[in-house]
Amino acid sequence: MTSSVQRLLELPRYASDGPHAIKPGFDRIESILEYMGRPDREMDIALVAGTNGKGSTASMMAACLTSAGYKTALQTSPHLLRINERMRVNGSEVPQDWLERAAGKHLTAFRDIGTSFYEATLALSLLWFAEVHATHAVVETGLGGRLDATNVLDASVSVITSVDLDHTELLADTIAATATEKAGIIKARKPVVLGNMYIEAAKVISDIALQREAPVWDFQPLAATYPSFQLALA
């Protein structure tokens, strides 16, 4: 018998169906979150985008929040072996029995609404986070930012780790245009954190942040120099 979790893989997904699985618009994710009772509004959310480094950055942010004593959720993609890997709270994956029950309960709604696999797993992640009373969630975007399903989330802070050319058939084919896509996650009057990136990209993002009255926190790599010295064994 095919499990409910395995049936989730039958929904349209980029990994198996390519670009055809990605449909623009927020109607589907908004509809499924409304149907679930808007679990995303039960926690403070940090949204992390970037061509490279967003997954590791999101993981480190979640680890820091957990260490500080917050019950912290982490949603990432893609998974390597199991869908459970996408959903963690305080470092622990979602239990398989919960995922089976939730997938079985909501699969018909996913199909009726036409949600993609990515949208469905995002919604299930947020539902579990709310049910276990996570106070904070770090959410990694999928592709781009502006049109990504995660952009319906009212994030308290946005993070853009880097900007480079990637998925040009879906997003953009210049650094400036790609930066504009990433900057789409910036929320009005809420801070955005920038990683190390091309000056051109940083300027585009900073200009968009200014338009939205969003504070910009620009972090550069730490550089350290050490005097020359020799080690000798006595």
Ranges and model annotations:
Residues 120, 136-140, 155-234:
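Acidic, Mg2+-coordinating active-site environments of NTP-dependent enzymes
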Residues 19-26, 30-43, 67-153, 169-171:
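ATP-dependent carboxylate-amine ligase catalytic core
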Residues 1-52, 56-71, 80-81, 97, ...:
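N-terminal leader/targeting and accessory segments in enzymes
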